[in-house]
Design a protein with these regions (language model features):
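Hydrophobic alpha-helical segments and helix pairs
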Residues: 77, 81-122
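Residues that cap or initiate secondary-structure elements
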Residues: 16-18, 69, 85, 99
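Hydrophobic beta-strand-centered segment that forms part of the acyl-chain substrate-binding groove
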Residues: 39-88
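Hot-dog-fold acyl-thioester-processing enzymes
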Residues: 1-58, 104, 111-140
Length: 140
């Protein structure tokens, strides 16, 4: 199931924190979007040819942190998918610091037709998601 996961390790920089040294949430969400895009490309559910026609958008997202992330913290972000429905697909993110899980995020993504501004089933445009058993969620 390793191919269902994507990772990024980074050290938090000064321009990513507030005046108290805590990581801005919008930077965290941007990193999530980046690793989700890399993951989608790796899984074959998004490519650059789709850019002007279709786009994956977050319909709902929930973030939980057990502790704040600070300037110069080294964090590992990871993401994976789970089984979806006809038009919505869950994605999970994990935040580790010092090899400890300090946060999680869950999101629901839908595919939009950019011209029609409507949800579209990925199957209708030839996208097939890989099987994603729930057991692999525990391995992150």
């Amino acid at each position: 199931m390793e191919d269902l996961k994507s990772y990024e390790t980074r050290v938090i920089e000064i321009n990513e924190v507030d005046d108290m040294g805590e990581y801005f949430f919008h930077h965290l969400l941007n990193r999530f979007a980046q690793i989700a895009t890399e993951s989608a490309m790796k899984l074959g559910v998004w490519n650059y040819d789709m850019m002007s026609k279709y786009g994956w958008v977050v319909a709902k997202q929930y973030l939980h942190l057990d502790e704040p992330i600070h300037y110069q913290d080294c964090i590992e972000l990871s993401t994976t998918i789970s089984k979806g429905t006809y038009v919505s697909f869950p994605r999970y993110y994990y935040i580790k610091k010092d090899n400890r899980l300090i946060g999680t995020c869950s999101s629901v993504w839908t595919l939009l037709d950019s011209q029609k501004r409507r949800m579209v089933s990925p199957q209708k445009i030839g996208i097939t998601f890989p099987e994603a058993p729930l057991e692999h969620l525990l391995e992150l």
